[in-house]
A protein has these predicted regions:
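Specific aromatic-rich, kink-prone transmembrane helix
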Residues: 40, 79-99, 112
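Perimembrane helix-loop-helix junctions
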Residues: 93-104, 126-163
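Transmembrane-helix motifs of polytopic, lipid-linked glycan transferases
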Residues: 28-48, 52, 86-90
Length: 168
């Protein structure tokens, strides 16, 4: 009901090809996804602050016993947390270029949100974050520009593109 089958579907062919035992392969893949979450945390911290901030963010995440313990054993929450943090990272990174997002950035945001949504239904909240980010930037841009129709059209095109990519 609350969990998507993406991670299990991803693991099935890997477990068929791996020479390791089924559970060992699943734990190894889960740990790799957890490592990607740590990398995403570093990048988000570096994007919001400095490389030192990113390093401290990643270090604090690694030193959190619950995250570290679940990294090897939780095939639902760790992939969701990883894809969620990647989504937040790409959303924050995209705030700098929100009206002029490149196709690559639209794909990155859409894929990250789509993976979070495919892992757990809680990923739907990322669409609300996207809407809040667009709304706040829209209000900020209205102070400097007198062409709200141009801004709304750009936001709608980007938002529909991100939604379509995430849906696929």
């Amino acid at each position: 009901l609350f969990y998507g089958g993406f991670f299990d579907a991803l693991l099935y062919p890997i477990t068929q090809l791996s020479p390791l035992l089924l559970h060992d392969t699943r734990h190894l893949c889960n740990a790799f996804i957890g490592l990607l979450g740590i990398v995403a945390t570093y990048r988000l911290g570096a994007c919001l602050g400095s490389p030192t901030t990113g390093l401290l963010s990643a270090l604090f995440l690694v030193l959190t016993p619950r995250f570290f313990g679940h990294t090897f054993n939780n095939p639902k929450d760790i992939p969701f947390a990883t894809f969620y943090i990647w989504s937040i990272y790409y959303l924050v990174q995209g705030l700098k270029f929100l009206l002029t997002l490149s196709k690559k950035q639209i794909w990155q945001i859409g894929i990250a949100i789509g993976l979070a949504l495919a892992t757990r239904v809680g990923g739907v909240i990322l669409f609300f974050y996207l809407g809040i980010f667009y709304g706040l930037v829209y209000l900020w841009m209205l102070q400097d520009r007198d062409r709200p129709a141009h801004i709304i059209r750009g936001f709608l095109i980007q938002g529909i593109g991100i939604f379509a990519i995430a849906y696929i």
